[in-house]
């Protein structure tokens, strides 16, 4: 019998109340599109609920790649800022858990893809900072038009960098965020921008695969980012 060598891809999860059947209870969950894209790319999705940070290294040792998913604001104290009046509630234990996962992944040189909050977490962990309320800079809510509604922004990409080498020079992307990168973290290079100047993607060229995007590729039909992550595990 041939062994199954499909790579295991960890997916960080939301913690929120959820309802199913007769139950309404706290749950660890993630939109199924994340898992669908990983599976289609040839990987096996592994959900990673919030855990003890001292378990992160053991978890990472069993994975072949990591996706840092979207979610709530990161605690401003983690990048040396006071909370903005428009900052939204953070989950300190999720910040701690995912920081530990990311640092263990970096130590192991595991391929990492950050999505929305995931890009912001990578930036903060590498010493960068965030704009806490993008409408103050962008002059509107085009990046997050309404609850439950994705905005669409046109972005310009550097085709000599990731993810532009995968997606091309210009593309419309779905987004839902009110924060964004301010100062880039150590080693990070911006590689995509919205028309209003918002950094929409960044990567660390010296790493095997360390890429973050501010938009939500899981709701697009183009699987290129997930395919590239899974390919990088080989």
Where are these regions (language model features)?
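N-terminal beta1-alpha1 cap of cysteine-dependent amidohydrolase-like domains
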Residues: 1-113, 124-126, 131, 135-164, ...
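Conserved G/P- and acidic residue-centered "switch" motifs that form tight phosphate/ATP-binding loops
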Residues: 116
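Hydrophobic, aromatic-enriched interface-forming segments
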Residues: 119-121
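Active-site-proximal beta-strand elements of phosphoester/diester hydrolases
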Residues: 210-215
């Amino acid at each position: 019998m041939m062994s199954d060598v499909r790579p295991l891809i960890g997916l960080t999860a939301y913690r929120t109340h959820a309802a199913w059947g007769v139950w309404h209870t706290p749950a660890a969950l993630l939109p199924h599109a994340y898992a669908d894209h990983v599976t289609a790319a040839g990987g096996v999705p592994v959900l990673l609920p919030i855990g003890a940070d001292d378990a992160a290294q053991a978890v990472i040792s069993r994975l072949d790649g990591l996706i840092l998913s979207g979610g709530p604001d990161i605690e401003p104290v983690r990048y040396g800022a006071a909370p903005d009046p428009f900052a939204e509630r953070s989950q300190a234990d999720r910040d701690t858990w995912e920081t530990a996962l990311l640092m263990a992944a970096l130590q192991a040189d595991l391929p990492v893809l950050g999505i929305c909050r995931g890009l912001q977490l990578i930036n903060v962990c590498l010493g960068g900072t965030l704009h806490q309320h993008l409408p103050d800079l962008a002059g509107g809510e085009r990046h997050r038009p309404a609850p439950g509604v994705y905005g669409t922004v046109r972005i310009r990409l550097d085709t000599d960098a990731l993810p532009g080498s995968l997606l091309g020079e210009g593309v419309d992307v779905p987004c839902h965020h009110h924060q964004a990168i301010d100062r880039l973290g150590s080693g990070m290079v911006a590689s995509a921008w919205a028309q209003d100047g918002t950094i929409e993607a960044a990567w660390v060229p010296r790493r095997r695969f360390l890429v973050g995007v501010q938009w939500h590729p899981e709701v697009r039909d183009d699987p290129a980012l997930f395919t590239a992550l899974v390919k990088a595990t080989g």
